[in-house]
Amino acid sequence: MMKDELMSDKKIGVAVIGSGSIATHRHAPEYAANPNVEIVAFVDRYPARAEKLAAKYGAKAFSDYKDVLALDSVDAVSVCVPNAFHAPIAIAALNAGKHTLCEKPMATSNEEAKEMIAASEKSGKFLMVGHNQRLASLHVKAKELLEAGTIGKIVSFRTSFSHPGPETWSIEGPTGWFFDKKQAFVGTMGDLGVHKADLLRWLLGEEIVEVASFVEHLEKPMGDVDDNAVCILKTSSGAIGTLTASWTHYPGEDNATYLYGTKGHIRLGADPRFSVLCFLKSGEKQYYEVGALQTNEGGGQSDTGVIRAFVNSILTNTAPEISGEEGRRALAIILACLKSSESKKFEKVEL
């Protein structure tokens, strides 16, 4: 996992743009726990939300992100607003000379994502996307096993991410932006599916090149976005698998991944005690107790590793591993799935 932060004489001044649930439960506490960070400001279109977090963490509250981007005391920002506003705010932050951590999905189109990457390159400031699944200890262990060739060449896979829906944990409940297509752009595929798209790319070490999918609004009466999706994916090497995402997992969560190789298979997050299980063709069984994925139902992750990675990149002047381009490629998979669901055809992923 990530090494502890390098201490610096000058703390990194951070502004959190968007003061909803992800800012409240992930970004704010993780920044506050980092010895190299000073939280300078919180921003929200609903002033009371920003004021509440500002009071808790000794920062200032703003209702307009442009006012925060003008502050010399702000070195970096987290973009935690509804999905449709990720790109314009991130681009503005990068153009203002601020390192930028953007929540996922990073944008609503490949074009927007490329504009964000271009802004990062032009400004010389880092752009990182908040894909935390690849930082989880069980997935790091799985990556080690795969790179060691433990289960041979991957031929198939399946991954799932599901829970009862954002209304159970979002600060806005059932009337929140998650269910409004104009603000959210997508539903479960943006909330959950894109996480697994990034995880699969990273674990397999190759691209998803072709997809077929059903991305549907089946149950949630309060919104007009997808609440269930089933996708078939094909990689550049020819491996095939499935990705499913759902907001109708009542109760609890499913966050498991299975990888099938020529020498055996790996189960991730399928056992309450041993989060990594490896079964080999030889009959050998390997059990790893490396920590489970924490759930929203259980209070969420206390340290996703994302903030630590972002801060370390700034301190060491090292480009983040979960870069804008990494975020774009995960987004491209989701966009291809959306296209396939509409066309009822196999669709290529824009690499």
For the regions a protein language model found, what residue spans apply to each?
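Active-site loop of classical SDR/Rossmann-like NAD(P)-dependent oxidoreductases
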Residues: I22, Q294-R308
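C-terminal helix-rich "cap/oligomerization" subdomain common to oxidoreductases
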Residues: M1-S8, A76-S78, A309-L351
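Conserved SAM-binding strand-loop segment of SAM-dependent methyltransferases
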Residues: G58-Y65
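Hydrophobic residues in well-ordered beta-strands that form the structural core
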Residues: A23, S63, V79, L101-E103, ...
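Predominantly a Rossmann-like dinucleotide-binding segment in NAD(P)-dependent oxidoreductases
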Residues: Q133-G223, K344
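Contiguous beta-strand/loop segments that form the cofactor/metal-binding neighborhood of enzyme cores
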Residues: D191, A197-F274, T304-N317
